[in-house]
Amino acid sequence: MSNYNVALVGDFNVSVIAHNAVPQALRLTGIDITPVWFHTSAISDPESQFADFDGIWCVPASPYANTEGALSAIRYARERGRPFLGTCGGFQHALLEYARNVCGLHQAANAETDPGAALRLIAPLACSLIEKSDDMLLTDGLLGQAYGQSRITEGYHCSYGLNRDYEALLFSGDLRVTARDLAGEVRGVELSGHPFFAATLFQPERRALRGETPPLVAAFVSALAA
């Protein structure tokens, strides 16, 4: 059986629920995976640092110590066709990376770290989703295929999401929405033409804490061997 290396991009903290769930989620897939944590402050040369990794998972718990480090890891995965999963903070930063480097929105910012920014792509949610669960509707795509259904319930730990004012600009190309909550807010995206590039504001890895294999994580792992 093959072994796959997965880079976990994020600043590990044992007190963060999702950080305990992520390795468990990978183990529950039944595939031999070696996860390696990358503190964002240590990311300086993605081309060499991630060359031997089969996939990259940008994990929750942001703001990160080094925003640019996280963004460079995401860009590497996007441009090099490496399977990529972003959850919670990883979702926010996947949107930032795409906005800046593909859409030309070079000033795109996260209001959590730059509340006075002119272009607040990531903005406060109307209602905080700290330790809450919510329903979402899935469209055809990676998420819908992974879950095998059009409506799901997943857990969150966040207060910031996509500013709806920028949806038209952000989703005019290959990046598309594949999950929305019942109010129509974006909760999941994927990149067309990429082997596997998916990001969700929710934290699918939390299912592992109940002994369940998270469907989206299983799909990500399957892409490692494709």
What residue spans do the PLM features occupy?
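N-terminal beta1-alpha1 cap of cysteine-dependent amidohydrolase-like domains
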Residues: 1-151, 156-174, 178-193, 201-226
